[in-house]
Amino acid sequence: METKNILTIGIDYRVVRGGVAAVENVYSTFYQPFNHVATVVDYGTMQKMMVFFKAYIQFWKWMLFHKEIEIVHVHGSSDASFWRKRIFINLAKMFGKKVVFHCHGSEFQRFSAQHRNAVQKTLIKCDCIIALSESWKCWFETTIHHKNVVVIKNVIALPRVKKVKHNNFVLLFLGRLGKRKGIYDLLDVLIKHKTTFEGKVKFLFGGDGDVEQVKEIIKQNGLENIAEFQGWVNGEKKEYLLNLADAFILPSYNEGLPISVLEAMSYSLPVISTTVGGIPEILKNGENGFIMEPGDKDAIYHAVVSLMEDKSLCKDMGKKSF
């Protein structure tokens, strides 16, 4: 697709971890050319400052010397990401460009009233907002009062599926380790039902964030035989784990439309997740997985046991995921 009139503002998708990087990487394969300015990397405060300053200079060059640019496609999230991207949105409008804000964030509703006003003043300038789900589309329309919000669900590259044979039931978690992704709820379930899972289930955790805290909980509660931390995984290692897993779990409290869930579904895995963001639009309870309210640990337990004890159910749900 010829896109010489589009400038994309995002992250350094070649080195940054996470879902937004994965989305931008896919876009880079069919935008021709992929005009791109990276505003952030995910390592070192000084490096982040240098990358942002470089991005600011690059953006001015694009605006001043590339008159063919008509549309600025801004990939942004909530928190610090939004405040960085706000600068580029305002500059793009100053140069008379059309701006598309592609929202990957899941915590805009937690902004204070003062910050929410700043968000509204910025986003109302955008010619279009891309939301990841109908629920987020509704939020932008009713809270930000934007009149041109469209839903484009996240995209992923199709995987190479080659299942790995194993004995125990394997449940996979991929995501940032912390409260928002529900990792502590899952650990509480493992602790409470340790005897049920021992010798039957292997829980594999992959991600960054509260790494040491999670490791310590596993060690203190003697979960080493059923829970195994994989570190940050991508590339071939992630492909291997998704081929190894029997099911995927992400008991989040806030989400847009998580790439990890889409990737798991592309590997024909049943998914255990929660009723947040765009997840209910792709996950149907009892069909391609189980879905529950955030924090419902009993529901998490029963979902895991249902898949663990019924291989036919697990396989059938997985087929319906893809």
Please state what every model-predicted region is.
Residues 285-286, 290-297, 306-311:
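Conserved acidic donor-binding segment of nucleotide-sugar-dependent glycosyltransferases
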